[in-house]
């Protein structure tokens, strides 16, 4: 596991900026991603029949990704990948649990009594991209995650929030099949454009020690 730390330089006075964010990258094990990619694409039409997600103002939302409403992304509130009856998904769930536990140990964070997950998937076709967005800043925000199922020369960029005006800085995470990324869920992120004829398929999720909505299911 590779741990990435966005951290300020030592402060020289009480008013200089400070930050200390963590994320990590690791490789999943024992998952057939070719089978999983086909399964998710075959399921796409069914997912698109679900209601579109809604924001706090009760308006349709794609999670601020700008992927649009004709997408699985925009149904993120109304299905949970972890409920799919699929062997590769079962193995993926265990990989997520293992990565979560290892990450907490690596950064010295306490383990929660319970862990809940909201999980969806994104399909980007040629010319599409996910715009800059974040998953939340409320007091219960915890960890977000991302698993690359299928990709061809794309990346996800995680921004260092305090430094985005004069000299914007970000961490580029290349989308490699099987890579699992965990990050503090208030870290804003985006992708570059998919220029390939093949779909960029990723599974994304929110983790929480508490059940934030009916769409969250308990995994620990």
Where are these regions (language model features)?
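A short, highly charged, low-complexity intrinsically disordered segment
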Residues: 2-8, 211-220
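Flexible domain-boundary/linker segments
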Residues: 53, 195-198, 220
């Amino acid at each position: 596991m590779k741990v990435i730390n966005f951290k300020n330089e030592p402060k020289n006075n009480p008013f200089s900026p400070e930050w200390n964010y963590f994320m990590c990258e690791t490789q999943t094990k024992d998952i057939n991603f070719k089978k999983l990619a086909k399964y998710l694409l075959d399921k796409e039409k069914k997912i698109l029949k679900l209601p579109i997600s809604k924001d706090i103002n009760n308006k349709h939302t794609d999670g601020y990704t700008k992927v649009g409403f004709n997408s699985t992304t925009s149904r993120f509130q109304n299905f949970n990948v972890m409920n799919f009856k699929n062997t590769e998904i079962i193995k993926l769930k265990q990989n997520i649990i293992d990565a979560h536990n290892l990450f907490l140990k690596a950064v010295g964070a306490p383990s929660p009594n319970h862990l809940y997950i909201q999980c969806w998937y994104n399909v980007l076709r040629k010319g599409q991209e996910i715009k800059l967005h974040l998953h939340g800043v409320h007091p219960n925000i915890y960890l977000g995650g991302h698993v690359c199922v299928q990709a061809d020369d794309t990346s996800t960029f995680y921004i260092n929030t305090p430094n985005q005006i004069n000299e914007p800085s970000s961490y580029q995470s290349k989308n490699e099949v099987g890579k699992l990324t965990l990050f503090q869920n208030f870290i804003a992120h985006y992708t570059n454009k998919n220029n390939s004829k093949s779909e960029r398929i990723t599974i994304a999720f929110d983790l929480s020690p508490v059940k934030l909505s009916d769409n969250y299911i308990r995994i620990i």
